[in-house]
Amino acid sequence: MSDEEKKRRAATARRQHLKSAMLQLAVTEIEKEAAAKEVEKQNYLAEHCPPLSLPGSMQELQELCKKLHAKIDSVDEERYDTEVKLQKTNKELEDLSQKLFDLRGKFKRPPLRRVRMSADAMLRALLGSKHKVNMDLRANLKQVKKEDTEKEKDLRDVGDWRKNIEEKSGMEGRKKMFEAGES
């Protein structure tokens, strides 16, 4: 083995060792975080949820249920209020970002997706298989027949300007122009 191969192998072995050491550290950190979250959860539950004491009589049990229902209602109201606030702020954020795009002159275009369905298949899917749908898009087009009009003939005649130039060029053309001018 040459020195270069030994160096390469040593470098790769060192890299592998460093990777494994980093992975071991990451695993221990994740385990510590999970344990900390569990402790935090237990503390929160102990703080916010009083221990359950079941009273002996039916009257006391009904009062406890009423208290719990009232607490559930208040929590639901808070949750609903926070959801409404979140929706408002999201809408406001979208409006502001749209204004920003408008001011910059850059419009965010949604990505177009290829539709692999023909118009007939799309209508069949929408209306169901009971309705027979045939969508001939050419049926509504206006029928146009090509006719030779005088304008087109005049345009073709004007298009023969090369012949007119050739006739007027040279001595013969000048002679014709001169003779036409005398008479």
Curated annotation (Swiss-Prot):
Q: Mind telling me which PANTHER family this protein's record contains?
A: TROPONIN I, TROPONIN I, FAST SKELETAL MUSCLE
- Transmembrane feature ranges: none
Mind listing the UniProt keywords for this protein, alphabetically? Acetylation, Actin-binding, Muscle protein
Q: Which domain of life is it from?
A: Eukaryota
Q: Which GO terms describe its biological process?
A: cardiac muscle contraction; skeletal muscle contraction
Taxonomic source organism: Gallus gallus (Chicken)
Q: How is it modified after translation?
A: The N-terminus is blocked.
Q: Which residues carry this modification: N-acetylserine?
A: 2
**Region span, Involved in binding TNC and actin:** 97-117
Q: Per its UniProt record, what SUPFAM superfamilies does this chain match?
A: Troponin coil-coiled subunits (SSF90250)
The name on file for this protein is Troponin I, fast skeletal muscle
Q: Kindly indicate whether the keyword Nucleotide-binding belongs to this entry.
A: no
**InterPro entries in the cross-refs:** Troponin, Troponin_I, Troponin_sf
Family membership noted in the UniProt record: Belongs to the troponin I family.
> What GO terms are given for molecular function?
actin binding
Annotated region (Involved in binding TNC), positions in chain: 2-48
Q: How does it assemble?
A: Binds to actin and tropomyosin.
